[in-house]
Amino acid sequence: MNRKTIQTATNDFSISRIKHFYTFGKKNMKMVAKFFKYEDKYFNTPFIKKIIVLTQTDLKSASFIIWLYETDDKGMPCILINESGILSKAYEGKTYTEVDITDLKIRFPSQGIFTVIELLEINENEFRFFYRFRGKGEKCIGSIIEPSIGAYPSTQGDTLILGGNGWRKNEIEKSILPRYKNKFHNLSIELELSDM
């Protein structure tokens, strides 16, 4: 029997056109979330088969965890769907990282679902680089936790960032990139749904 699948389509930008990435330094909160609204067309494919995340890393590989949440009446993540995190790995370069979760048999909730990405502050995920302040010759060392998660520009916001006071919605951002200027920067994540 052939398996029927369908993919959510929130991002119509090709990988080469994605120029903005969510990147986190050490000691910062490292969780971002994307909301997927339930649509009637998902009725015949109710199971989440794959989670597809646009990642970028300068390391050979970088690990991250995926959590899935139901939403509360205020539009925030509230009920954890998967009891343990889905450990995932991004590989060097800018690429779509596909995570198959067929075995978990998770149904797409009728009130929608949050896909949460948690970056891990471990030595293997730390990327160090040198930089200089403008007008100063002094060389400094910086570091970020990888992978970075891609974002596409949109007039509608669907992304949350976890901060010291809990989840907050992303805001319209000023950007030097014309395509991203005065737009929301939404996480480039898709779900592939299946009928079994």
Region locations from a protein language model:
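Aromatic- and Gly/Pro-enriched, solvent-exposed loop/edge beta-strand patches characteristic
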Residues: S63-K139
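Beta-sheet-rich sandwich/jelly-roll-like modules and their strand-loop junctions
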Residues: M1-T71, E118-M196
